[in-house]
């Protein structure tokens, strides 16, 4: 709604103008406004159309015109007794003075804000009095959604993926829809939040959690219900099977070959060691056999005949 009206002088002006209107009889003057709401984009100008049918000989000195908010009765703009009383709304409103004499009582509202949204009443008094209200709807288109993934790498089928759709600076609150690659609506595991900034415009963040398949496309649609304008965003996710890149494959093959060669070399060395050890053991055993035979010969006892001969020789 409109805010920030003027001080006591504005109130006096309103009461005076309304007093003039109330003294008039209701009847002949017919005020016409648009039945459909006037839609205005933020930061643009809007025209609230209001008209009446002046009778022959009509002069602006006979005209009393007031624009005010329907709900709060706060003054927006007035024209009384041939003088434009100006805007009580931050100097952002204006009439069409050259067209007043033709019955055009429309109001021009400049640099529309979110707080301007609401119903405005057009009061016209010449000799008789009539009024009508027109609605102003404020809108702002949403930006193209940005899509983010978490996690965003090393994705495998079966992983739980969080997809966030973000759109900014829109009004009024958006409607958010998710669909898969086949156009099937996704309503489960969706969380949407909308927060207004200092200007009253909304930032939208919608989160979808899905289990990743072999591949999939997910789209987010942010709709402005007043403008019937859709902003689209999509992301395609491919769950890659666990495979090796060519570089890693060659490294793996090279390491495997080196390992095989190392094992063969190690086996050959072990075989040589075992063979050498066996040969040394065999050689030692043969040496021990030769020494045993020599010892047996040296320790062989003398025969009796040999003892007798020795004895006889000693006697002789």
Curated annotation (Swiss-Prot):
Residues 29-139 form the Ig-like V-type domain. Ubiquitous. Residues 270-316 are cytoplasmic. The chain crosses the membrane at residues 249-269. Disruption phenotype: Mice display a lower bone mineral density in cortical bones with femurs more susceptible to bone fracture, but do not exhibit any important skeletal abnormalities. Calvarial cells reveal normal number of osteoblast precursor cells with adequate proliferative capacity, but have impaired osteogenic differentiation. Furthermore, following cardiac transplantation, they display permanent survival under rapamycin regimen and cardiac transplants also show markedly decreased production of key cytokine and chemokine. The incidence of chronic transplant rejection is also inhibited. Disulfide bonds join 165-220. SMART domains: IG (SM00409), IGc2 (SM00408), IGv (SM00406). One of its GO terms (cellular component) is external side of plasma membrane. It is found in: Membrane. Keywords: Disulfide bond, Glycoprotein, Immunoglobulin domain, Membrane, Signal, Transmembrane, Transmembrane helix. Residues 29-248 are extracellular. Residues 280-316 are annotated as: Disordered. Glycans are attached at residues 104, 189, 215. It is a single-pass type I membrane protein. Residues 1-28 form the signal peptide. InterPro entries: BTN3A2-like_Ig-C, CD276_IgV, Ig-like_dom, Ig-like_dom_sf, Ig-like_fold, Ig_sub, Ig_sub2, Ig_V-set. It comes from the Eukaryota. Residues 145-238 form the Ig-like C2-type domain. Residues 280-292 have a biased composition (Acidic residues). The keyword Disulfide bond applies. Induction: Up-regulated in cells mediating rejection of mouse transplant. Modulates T-cell-mediated immune responses and the development of acute and chronic transplant rejection. Plays a positive regulatory role in bone formation and has a dual role in the bone-immune interface. Induces antitumor immunity as it activates both acquired and innate immunity leading to natural killer cell and CD8 T-cell dependent killing of tumor cells. Interacts with TREML2 and this interaction enhances T-cell activation. Belongs to the immunoglobulin superfamily. BTN/MOG family. Gene transfer of B7-H3 leads to complete regression of 50 per cent tumors, or significantly slows tumor growth. In primates, B7-H3 locus underwent genomic duplication leading to tandemly repeated immunoglobulin-like V and C domains (VC domains). The dominantly expressed human B7-H3 isoform contains tandemly duplicated VC domains. In contrast, mouse B7-H3 transcript contains only one single VC domain form due to an exon structure corresponding to V domain-(pseudoexon C)-(pseudoexon V)-C domain. This duplication appearing in primates is suggested to be very recent supporting a model of multiple independent emergence of tandem VC repeats within human and monkey species. This is CD276 antigen. The lineage of its organism: Eukaryota, Metazoa, Chordata, Craniata, Vertebrata. The gene is Cd276.
């Amino acid at each position: 709604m409109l805010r920030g009206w003027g001080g006591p002088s504005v109130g006096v002006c309103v009461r005076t103008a309304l007093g003039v209107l109330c003294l008039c009889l209701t009847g002949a003057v017919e005020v016409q406004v648009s039945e459909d709401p006037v839609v205005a984009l933020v930061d643009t100008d809007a025209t609230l159309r209001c008209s009446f049918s002046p009778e022959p000989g009509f002069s602006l000195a006979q005209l009393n015109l007031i624009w005010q908010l329907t709900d709060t009765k706060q003054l927006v703009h007035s024209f009384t007794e041939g003088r434009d009383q100006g805007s009580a709304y931050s100097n952002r409103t204006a009439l069409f003075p050259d067209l007043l004499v033709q019955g055009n009582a429309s109001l021009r509202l400049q640099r529309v804000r979110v707080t301007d949204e609401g119903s405005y009443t057009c009061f016209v008094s010449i000799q008789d009095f009539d009024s009508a209200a027109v609605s102003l709807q404020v809108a702002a288109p949403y930006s193209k959604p940005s899509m983010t993934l978490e996690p965003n790498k090393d994705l495998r089928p079966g992983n739980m993926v969080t997809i966030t759709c973000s759109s900014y600076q829109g009004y009024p609150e958006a409607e958010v829809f998710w669909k898969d690659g086949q156009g099937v609506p996704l309503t489960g595991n969706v969380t949407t939040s909308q927060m207004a900034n200092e200007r009253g415009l909304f930032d939208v963040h919608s989160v979808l959690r899905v289990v990743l398949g072999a591949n999939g496309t997910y789209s987010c649609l942010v709709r402005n219900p007043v403008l019937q304008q859709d902003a689209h965003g999509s992301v395609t996710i491919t769950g890659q099977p666990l495979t090796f890149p060519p570089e890693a494959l060659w490294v793996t093959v090279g390491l495997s070959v080196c390992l095989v060669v190392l094992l063969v070399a190690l086996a050959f060395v072990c075989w040589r060691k075992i063979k050498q050890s066996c040969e040394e053991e065999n050689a030692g055993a043969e040496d021990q056999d030769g020494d045993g035979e020599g010892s047996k010969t040296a320790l062989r006892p003398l025969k009796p005949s040999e003892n007798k001969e020795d004895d006889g020789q000693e006697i002789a």
